[in-house]
Amino acid sequence: KVIALKDVTMKLKKGEIMCLLGDNGAGKSTLIKTLAGVHKPDEGEIVIEGEKTVFDSPKDALDMGIGTVYQDLALVPLMSVTRNFFMGREPLKGPPFLKTFDIEKANQIAAERMGQIGIDVRDPSQAVGTMSGGERQCLAISRAIYFGAKVLVLDEPTSALGVHQASMVLKYIVKAAS
């Protein structure tokens, strides 16, 4: 029997930033996936705002305000900034029986949210693959916050980034925490 996590206790308060460090195979990814609702703990409990919580799926974690940004970012390089920002949660317009994607509103929201973090998206229809690694990371974080994340779990948010891009991402993380 493999014990991936043992005696893990974490307490986070609003605005806090916590960094989890450990060797390869130490259980960091398992903890992240447990907090994200991918894995269920065999024992122990997850307590959020004083309530014991069980996640049956990643959607349950999202519904509780836990937004996870994985190392691969879950972005589609050939899709636009706007499409990647909304990813299945697009704003809709029209009558209830014939709703369509409100691209104008979506473009406006995506550009505004990216602008709030200092990234000028002149054309929200541009492919995400044309953005720098730091800009893509900030897009993924901004998306999680926009859709209600109270707690952001970031899996290696600066890996494979240059010094300037890593600095941009870390500044945004600090800004998001405040």
Spell out what each predicted region is.
Residues 1-178:
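Glycine-rich phosphate-binding loops of nucleotide-dependent enzymes
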